Amino acid sequence: MNKNPVILNFNDTLLHQSDVDLLNGPHWLNDNIITFYFEYLEKVAYLGEKNLLFISPEVVQCLKATKASELSVFLDPLAAKQRKFVFLALNNCEIMDKAGGSHWSLLVYSQPEETFYHFDSLKGTNYKQAAKLCGKLLKYLNPNGTGDFIENDALQQNNSYDCGVFVLCHVDLLANYSLQNNRISGCGWTTQEYVKSKRSSILHIIKNLQSKGY
């Protein structure tokens, strides 16, 4: 008997029971859950929306390990230069070829503003990682290789395990805001209430997709 069965097979993402269990309690969210949610945004919530790009943790790790001159290998197939807003799930893992790390944050590129915004629920924790990746990506995304980097104020977590949940809440807020306002600046904050409800919200999404045969 498989003790860790596949719960959901959604496009390019497989969720096992151990992944889904992370949503049921006070647990740190792993790469698989965040990748699933980013894919859900792309394939369901914002299906057909060409102005938004959601880049999964696995691809972000590859970008961190790749020379600026070679980023096109990963980003050209995603049409990154044609997107107005690019969302990257950033981890502080220093081992470039495997999953890991202890903290998630969100890096967002706003093409209309030529600016990277970093949203960190433990402000300063992933600053070094975000600034380094920003400098590399600007050489690819902006023909002039120039742009700004802003460590944005954001709602702060009060525990050691909700950073991934905060990333997903930030994505929800910013994706909607950016489409309505054509910018990231002035976006405001997510709320503690929204953060508290996010795990159950994702579980509901998973059950809904299961009912559709995924």
What are these regions (language model features)?
Residues 1-105, 109-115:
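Cysteine protease catalytic domains with a Cys-His-Asp triad
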Residues 66-212:
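Cysteine protease-like catalytic core of ubiquitin/ubiquitin-like
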